């Protein structure tokens, strides 16, 4: 984009869509070096890539699935850096959407642990809702303990 032209919402959206598509293409690449470089740079892509990466986490190719998981963690940790409150909130909301019952347990479990690093007080209720889930209750309990504020501990 030219620095002299105003940036429109459509232009930003197109850039984000392209960045996500490029990231997913590289995560799925057959070359391990390409995949590694992709997941290492995923933090800059941010929240727009969360749901696409979660889908790739279930890929039949274990190395591709692992690269997608690493990319998601990179995004979470990048968003959790000091001074990135708005980015952290956006990523947390999108990671929270991965807790939905239509996702595989492995994806939901990983999302829980990601929220333990960037969890918002507003996300305690959905996490606490998983305390009744047979497959995820222990993870949900530990995540609430890890968040450790009064609201999360009261949810236990």
Predicted regions and their residues:
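A conserved position within tetratricopeptide repeats
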Residues: 27, 57, 98-99, 131
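Repeat-mediated protein-protein interaction surfaces in helical alpha-solenoids
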Residues: 18-21, 91-95
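Mature N-terminal segment immediately following signal peptide/propeptide cleavage
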Residues: 25-31
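Active-site metal-coordination segments of metallo-dependent hydrolases
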Residues: 60
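Conserved beta-strand positions that form and line the central face of beta-propeller blades
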Residues: 26, 52, 94
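Structural detector for internal amphipathic alpha-helices that build alpha-solenoid repeat scaffolds
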Residues: 2-15, 33-47, 52-55, 63-86, ...
